[in-house]
């Protein structure tokens, strides 16, 4: 089976999709967002395609496309849709790696009684945890790491996003016993080229090897 990496986060709106685009490009991977909630603006798949300059055949179609920009369990209810977590299984990517992006944080509910964490535990694929660098990140990051490990999920490391914060980054990695993969800074002009350069300066492909 081709390499598969799950990208999750400590919260929503922290830059997880931008990092997923960067990782997809770095690995020459395909990309899959199992559940897209919010269709009025650019979807996460389209944003990743633009920022990673992906051909259409490297985008795996979403299993569910929901109109409301909300937690998947609520967006599905508003659309009158029933999400079946057991159907969230990506197709074969022909030997190419696959980057899978969750929604929001680790504990976001997919249904009334199923969390994304439950799906990650069933998949048992390694996870990259995206964490912001601003105030409050230590608590959120350590709780997320504890939740993942409580279900036996391997964590490749933490990808920090935001302005440099050496103490918070070091504290999270030391207390969380986790690898620091790098830090993706805020980019004044976010393009495929600027993202590629930022990733090349901070991240190593070897750190994501199976």
UniProtKB/Swiss-Prot annotation:
E.C. number: 6.3.3.3
Cofactor: Mg(2+)
Keyword Manganese: no
A Gene Ontology biological process term: biotin biosynthetic process
Enzyme active site: 33
GO cellular component labels: cytosol
Catalyzed chemical reaction(s): (7R,8S)-7,8-diammoniononanoate + CO2 + ATP = (4R,5S)-dethiobiotin + ADP + phosphate + 3 H(+)
Binding site for Mg(2+): 17, 101
Principal localisation: cytoplasm
Subunit structure: Homodimer.
Family statement drawn from the similarity comment of this UniProt entry: Belongs to the dethiobiotin synthetase family.
Protein name: ATP-dependent dethiobiotin synthetase BioD
Species this protein is from: Bradyrhizobium sp. (strain BTAi1 / ATCC BAA-1182)
Gene designation per UniProt: bioD
């Amino acid at each position: 089976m081709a390499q598969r990496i799950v990208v999750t986060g400590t919260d929503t709106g922290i830059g997880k999709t931008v990092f997923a685009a960067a990782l997809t490009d770095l690995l020459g991977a395909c990309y899959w967002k199992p559940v897209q909630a919010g269709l009025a603006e650019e979807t996460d798949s389209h944003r990743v395609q633009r920022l990673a300059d992906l051909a259409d055949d490297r985008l795996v179609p979403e299993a569910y496309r929901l109109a409301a920009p909300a937690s998947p369990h609520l967006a599905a209810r508003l659309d009158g849709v029933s999400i079946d977590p057991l159907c969230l299984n990506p197709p074969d990517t022909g030997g190419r790696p696959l980057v899978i992006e969750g929604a929001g944080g680790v504990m976001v509910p997919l249904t009334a009684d199923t969390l994304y964490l439950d799906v990650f535990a069933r998949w048992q694929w390694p996870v990259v945890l995206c964490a912001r660098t601003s105030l409050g990140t230590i608590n959120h990051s350590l709780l997320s790491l504890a939740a993942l490990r409580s279900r036996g999920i391997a964590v490749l490391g933490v990808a920090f996003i935001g302005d440099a914060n050496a103490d918070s980054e070091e504290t999270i990695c030391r207390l969380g016993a986790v690898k620091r993969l790098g830090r993706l800074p805020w980019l004044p002009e976010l393009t495929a080229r600027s993202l590629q350069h930022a990733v090349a300066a901070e991240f190593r492909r070897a750190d994501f090897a199976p």
